[in-house]
Curated annotation (Swiss-Prot):
PANTHER family: ALKYL HYDROPEROXIDE REDUCTASE AHPD (PTHR33930), BLR3452 PROTEIN (PTHR33930:SF2). This is Uncharacterized protein MJ0742. To M.jannaschii MJ1511. GO terms for molecular function: oxidoreductase activity; peroxiredoxin activity. InterPro entries: AhpD-like, CMD-like.
Length: 104
């Protein structure tokens, strides 16, 4: 499942133009997302919280879309994560991410 989420359109360009870099990125992805302790769904929810805390609108939307499409993560599950973001990163990060979630 993780490969379906990771290998999107942008990675096709990297694979074609920079195959050595692509191989390194794939190895890093496989090393990070092992599923040994936390399953991929949990790791994806953590990733959403991280990008939401950084207020990176493009990354927030990409992470949320792939989470819902590829992993079946619900808006309610994402909202739970965003409530943690509210406590750890403040209202601006929370409201920005919630607005993005509401549009999806």
């Amino acid at each position: 499942m993780k490969n379906e989420v990771f290998f999107g359109e942008g990675m096709k360009v990297v694979k074609e133009k920079y195959p050595d870099l692509y191989d390194i990125i794939v190895k890093l992805n496989d090393t990070v997302f092992t599923g040994k302790t936390l399953d991929y769904k949990t790791q994806k929810l953590i990733a959403i919280g991280i990008v939401a805390s950084r207020c990176d609108e493009v990354a927030i939307e990409k992470q949320m879309k792939s989470a819902m499409k590829e992993l079946g993560i619900t808006k309610e599950e994402i909202a739970d994560v965003l409530r943690v973001v509210l406590l750890t990163s403040g209202m601006p990060a929370f409201t920005k991410a919630m607005k993005i979630l509401e549009k999806l």
